[in-house]
Amino acid sequence: MDLSLLLPKRSWEISGGADKISRVAMSLKNIVKNKYKAIGRRGRSHIAPEGSSVSSSLSTNEGLNQSIWVDLPPELLLDIIQRIESEQSLWPGRRDVVACASVCKSWREMTKEVVKVPELSGLITFPISLRQPGPRDAPIQCFIKRERATGIYRLYLGLSPALSGDKSKLLLSAKRVRRATGAEFVVSLSGNDFSRSSSNYIGKLRSNFLGTKFTVYENQPPPFNRKLPPSMQVSPWVSSSSSSYNIASILYELNVLRTRGPRRMQCIMHSIPISAIQEGGKIQSPTEFTNQGKKKKKPLMDFCSGNLGGESVIKEPLILKNKSPRWHEQLQCWCLNFKGRVTVASVKNFQLVAAAAEAGKNMNIPEEEQDRVILQFGKIGKDIFTMDYRYPISAFQAFAICLSSFDTKPVCE
């Protein structure tokens, strides 16, 4: 990328003017070209001993090249990243913003300051955005593809496969694993890596035998408290890298009498307080992934003991319930207004709103918040579903809730 094309006229006067900007822009091309030439001259069969002049010269050159980008004036760096961030609001162009954060530490810190969280920008940029609450106004629109043969579910950013095409951004993937006591969905940042020991592992969804109760686990502690009591933790079998935290419970109402009607569900968000949707309410967003794989192994008693310290768990969590549909006499079916995002009737379709009645009348929750759809999910074609979510839940939480709708529930229908 030619950085000189991104500069406004006023930036040409900063720290040496156009000549310095041109040199900086051209240096990146020279760095890449020289490295490829050096590799070609040495060949794959050449082995450089440790401490040799070759390795020392390479480290010197890398340090020199690194300093070129570090020494950019902050005003100029801010202006460059702001222009890239404003011009690339959609994927795959959004990759340029991610590339800015990969140059060096100073670029990464500046990019983190410029790029806002999804709650404010309505955009998903970094992997951590998948754990941050969605926007308050317009929802983030996604779609899910189901592969029946492999039991894999993939979440993409976009309106639909037909409209997004090859520009669809893969956000999360889940693989269904059958257990003797129920089903388990392993959620990953990758499309084909579902190992719990992998850095792509983000969490899981586990069901009971009847498929009426689901528990959402995350491998990162909630941002409001890095130390949770034993009731909110799952003891790892091997090491602390496989630690899981109970962040939500999904309950489907039993239909013992087999009466006619849609499914009824309730979601208890253990990591989101009811105050998040109150007037002036906020929720703390995670800012980074904690690398638990580098931590030392801990004995199981550390997770089972009650002396963990930290703040208390949320006493009044946010509760979501499915919006009651209306019966359409002419169509002879239950209907909800999905505003064109759902086109095929299915028992899996639902809309979730805040259960204000269960929270009590004195919770100071505005009426518009009580009627606002926080998550909606529905079918638009064979093995294709839409998922739209908004504040205060994250993409991972929304995806986990939608995955629960795919599991078979013979006693709930």
From Swiss-Prot:
Query: Its Gene Ontology biological processes?
Result: pollen development; regulation of DNA-templated transcription
- Output the superkingdom of the source species: Eukaryota
Q: In which tissues is it expressed?
A: Ubiquitous, with higher levels in flowers.
Q: Select a single GO molecular function from the record's annotations and give it.
A: transcription cis-regulatory region binding
InterPro entries annotated for this entry?
F-box-like_dom_sf, F-box_dom, Tubby-like_C, Tubby_C, Tubby_C_CS
Report the SUPFAM superfamilies cross-referenced here.
F-box domain, Tubby C-terminal domain-like
A Pfam match is Tub
Please list the residue ranges annotated as the F-box domain.
67-122
Assigned protein family: Belongs to the TUB family.
**Name of this protein:** Tubby-like F-box protein 6
Q: Which organism is it from?
A: Arabidopsis thaliana (Mouse-ear cress)
Q: Which gene encodes it?
A: TULP6
